[in-house]
Structures are given as structure tokens and as C-alpha cells.
Curated annotation (Swiss-Prot):
Quaternary structure and partners: Homodimer.
Taxonomic source organism: Pseudomonas paraeruginosa (strain DSM 24068 / PA7) (Pseudomonas aeruginosa (strain PA7))
Entry's Gene Ontology cellular component terms: cytoplasm
Family note: Belongs to the aerobic coproporphyrinogen-III oxidase family.
InterPro entries: Coprogen_oxidase_aer, Coprogen_oxidase_aer_sf, Coprogen_oxidase_CS
Cofactor: a divalent metal cation
Subcellular locations according to the entry: Cytoplasm
Residues that bind a divalent metal cation: H97, H107, H146, H176
Protein name, per record: Oxygen-dependent coproporphyrinogen-III oxidase
Annotated pathway: Porphyrin-containing compound metabolism; protoporphyrin-IX biosynthesis; protoporphyrinogen-IX from coproporphyrinogen-III (O2 route): step 1/1
Enzyme Commission number(s) from the entry: 1.3.3.3
Name of the top EC class for this enzyme: oxidoreductase
Amino acid sequence: MTDRIAAVKTYLLDLQDRICAALEAEDGKARFAEDAWERPAGGGGRTRVIGDGALIEKGGVNFSHVFGDSLPPSASAHRPELAGRGFQALGVSLVIHPENPHVPTSHANVRFFCAEKAGEEPVWWFGGGFDLTPYYASEEDCVHWHRVARDACAPFGADVYPRYKEWCDRYFHLKHRNEPRGIGGLFFDDLNQWDFDTCFAFIRAIGDAYIDAYLPIVQRRKHTPFDERQREFQAYRRGRYVEFNLVFDRGTLFGLQSGGRTESILMSLPPQVRWGYDWKPEPGSEEARLTEYFLTDRDWLAGQP
């Protein structure tokens, strides 16, 4: 697996570079600061953070490559046969929180796991996806986001996008709120249904599609005027983001349980957030429309070319 792991690592480092360059160019003011780190138990990474920009209030694009003698519980709980195997985990994970409430928060992740044991075949899989969390949503943006996701999946089978779109809707669901985190996109894990080269090609297609999915939305919305009321609603909705990441997110749990770097793991949290007791938007308002129309696990491409 050594050559394969090296190829995945080369791609992920290049992907991090390309995404950071594209986001810096779009912001036009802020620059990513890099923090290279090492994990005492094995491995390390490159954390890149950005903030206080013309567009991005807070964001991060992280690369990590960690390894150890046994998988943490979050990774082996649904695959107990992997308990006791040594592992390597590589990935790029990013979250972008724009200041303007009309520009959605975006998240993307592509990752590779390999679990090995002497005398046995290695077990490997890929995971990843991308999802969008709007505050003042636009149907045009939702359709675009999902169209790019569908087109990235298309060369790998007509059933791939619907299956991973539904998985995304199911995964990014706040059970205690009974509502989605956002308007979804793609999510998949344990991907080894094809040969390695095909799975790796799929991961590259998804990683490369993120900028094509996100930047046109940013460009359409970043100059939309906003007021303090809309910023307050954004902070309220960001609370849902925090709740999901700290309670349900498998990547967060894996990082914390495997002795990962806390600052990098919690990089995904927004800079300002608020909770109000039993707060509800005014009926018929833009804020109410978010949950009533957009956060409903819709088929955004129904009737679309």
C-alpha cells in the first residue's frame, strides 16, 4: 500500500494548495496562515486558517496524515473486525464561514483510511463529500450546488449521486432538533466498492468539484447588503452547526479520540454564535422560509437538466 498512500498524499497536498489559492483570490484581502504540526503518536499535518477578510470571517483548510497501532472507537465501532489493526488516515477537511449572511457556509472533506495487520490483506476505504449551509438561501444556488455534485458523480454511475445525496441528507441531520444542518450535497464513507484506482479517481472528482460548486455562489452573493438583524440570525443558525459538529460529526469524534490536534479539529467552529431560548422566526419571514422550504431534504434537481 505504500505507493498508493504516497499517491493519495500527493493529491491531497495539491488539493489543499489549490483550494487555498482559489479562496484567497476570491477574498482579495485575507491570506491563509499555515501551522505545520506533528502528532506525538505518529503523523502530523498542515493546518491553514484564514479570517477577518473581505469575504471570509473564519475558515480553515486542513491536511492531516496520522497513523497508529489501533483505530479509535469512532472508526472501529461500525467495523469491529478492524479492532487491533494499525491504521493510517489521510485527509483534507475544510470549513468556510463567510461574514455576509447571504453567502452560505461550506464544508468539504476527502479522506483515506488504511488498516493493516501482519499476515493479512490491508483493509482500505475512502470517504468524503461536500455540503452547504445557507442562512438566506436561494433556489438558484441550491440547484447549482447539487448540479455540480451530480455531474462529478456521473462518470461513476447514474445511481451514485442519488445514493450519496440521500446519505448526506441522512448524515447531516440534527436528531435532537429533527432538522437538517443545511441543504446537503454529497456524503459517503467506507468506499471500496470499486478497485482502488476507480475509488481514487472518484475522490479526486469530488475534491476537484468543490471550488466549482462554491465559488459561483460566493460571487453571486458576496456583495448583497445585510444588516445587524440578519447577522443575528446567521449567528443563531450557526448554533446548529456547532451542535452537529460537537455531538454527531464522525470526523470530529475520530480526531479527538485518536489524539488528534484539538485546535485543528475544532477549526470548523464559527467565530460568533448565539443561542436564544425557544427562539422562532416571524411567520412568513425570510428566516422562517429557511426551515420551511429549504431545510427539507428536497430533490433540488427534479425537472432540472
